[in-house]
Amino acid sequence: MELPAVNLKVILLGHWLLTTWGCIVFSGSYAWANFTILALGVWAVAQRDSIDAISMFLGGLLATIFLDIVHISIFYPRAGLTDTGRFGAGMAILSLLLKPLSCCFVYHMYRQRGGFLGSSQDRSAYQTIDSAEAPANAFAVPEGRGQDARGY
């Protein structure tokens, strides 16, 4: 299944807007966690070829899914919620619901930048130092053969 091309800037703008509205009700640690991850997203936009930037943004998005669940479940006001408060809580919940989809798009971008999740990568193109294979230069002559040692 081919994912549609979604610009990273659109993902950032959407989550920034939803996080800003979510901060109407949930401030403090909710704001710090989400805006810090959005700063990593800005870094990923600024450095288009960086695998580190996009992988840290992806990891941060995954972490904020868990953190948002904790923040919303602990700090959701049970009584006296105004219309503005309901709107802010709804936007925070909408941001939480959209984060897994955003993670899929960001993971796709991570793979496009050359990222690979796993411990073993293909290293068949590399030659080990103690390899006994012939040198790459066909005209290279091993030491002591074909050349006279000249002393001064």
Curated annotation (Swiss-Prot):
Cytoplasmic compartment spans: 45-55, 108-152
Keyword Membrane: yes
Keyword Transmembrane found: yes
Chain positions with Phosphothreonine modification: 128
Coiled-coil features, chain-numbered ranges: none
Side Extracellular, residues: 1-23, 77-86
Gene: AGTRAP
Function: Appears to be a negative regulator of type-1 angiotensin II receptor-mediated signaling by regulating receptor internalization as well as mechanism of receptor desensitization such as phosphorylation. Also induces a decrease in cell proliferation and angiotensin II-stimulated transcriptional activity.
Membrane-spanning segments: 24-44, 56-76, 87-107
Full protein name: Type-1 angiotensin II receptor-associated protein
Primary subcellular site in the record, as a coarse category: endoplasmic reticulum
Subunit structure: Interacts with RACK1, and with the carboxy-terminal region of AGTR1.
